[in-house]
C-alpha cells in the first residue's frame, strides 16, 4: 500500500472523497437544470414566469455549496453530506419516478429532443446525477459510521 495514503489520516480521505462527490453532484445538478431550461418543459422561475417544483429544486445548491465550502476549509461534514444526498435523492426520485402524475417523467427527459443523441445525453446526465447522489449518500454514511466507531 502507498505510504502516503497510509500516513494520511482517515478523516482526510473521507473529506477528499466527500468533496469530490459533492463537486460531481453539483456539476451534474447544474447540467440537469440546464437540460430542463433547454428543453423548455418542467422549467420555472427564474427562466419562466411561474413558480414550479423546478424553482424549488434550485434550492439544492443552498445545501451543496456550504458542504463544498466546509470540505475546502478542512471539515469532513459527513452528516451534512448525508442529509444533502438524501434530500437530493428524495427530490429527484419524487419528480422523475414516483406516481403517475409525477412532475418530469423520463419520457419528458428523452422524448422532447428531436435528436435521439441529445435525448440520450439528457438521460446520461440524469443517471449520472442519481448515481452521484447514491455514491455521496453511501460515502457519507460510511464516514458517519466510521467516526462513531472511532469514538468508542
Say what each PLM segment does.
Residues 1-25, 145-147:
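Cytosolic juxtamembrane helix and N-cap/initiation of the first transmembrane helix
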Residues 18-28, 56, 82-88, 122-129:
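Hydrophobic alpha-helical transmembrane segments of polytopic
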Residues 40-49, 95-122:
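Interfacial non-cytosolic loop connecting adjacent transmembrane helices
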Residues 68-98:
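Loop-to-transmembrane helix junctions at the membrane interface
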Residues 136-152:
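Cytosolic juxtamembrane helix at the C-terminal end of the final transmembrane segment
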Amino acid at each position: 500500500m502507498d505510504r502516503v495514503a497510509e500516513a494520511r489520516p482517515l478523516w482526510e480521505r473521507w473529506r477528499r472523497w466527500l468533496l469530490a462527490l459533492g463537486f460531481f453532484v453539483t456539476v451534474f445538478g447544474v447540467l440537469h437544470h440546464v437540460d430542463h431550461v433547454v428543453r423548455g418543459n418542467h422549467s420555472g422561475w427564474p427562466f419562466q414566469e411561474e413558480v414550479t417544483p423546478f424553482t424549488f429544486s434550485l434550492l439544492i445548491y443552498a445545501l451543496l455549496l456550504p458542504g463544498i465550502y466546509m470540505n475546502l476549509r478542512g471539515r469532513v461534514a459527513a452528516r451534512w453530506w448525508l442529509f444533502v444526498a438524501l434530500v437530493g435523492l428524495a427530490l429527484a426520485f419524487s419528480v422523475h419516478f414516483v406516481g403517475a402524475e409525477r412532475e418530469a417523467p423520463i419520457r419528458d427527459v428523452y422524448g422532447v429532443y428531436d435528436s435521439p443523441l441529445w435525448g440520450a445525453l439528457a438521460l446520461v446526465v440524469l443517471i449520472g446525477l442519481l448515481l452521484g447522489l447514491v455514491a455521496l449518500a453511501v460515502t457519507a454514511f460510511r464516514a458517519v459510521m466510521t467516526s462513531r466507531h472511532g469514538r468508542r
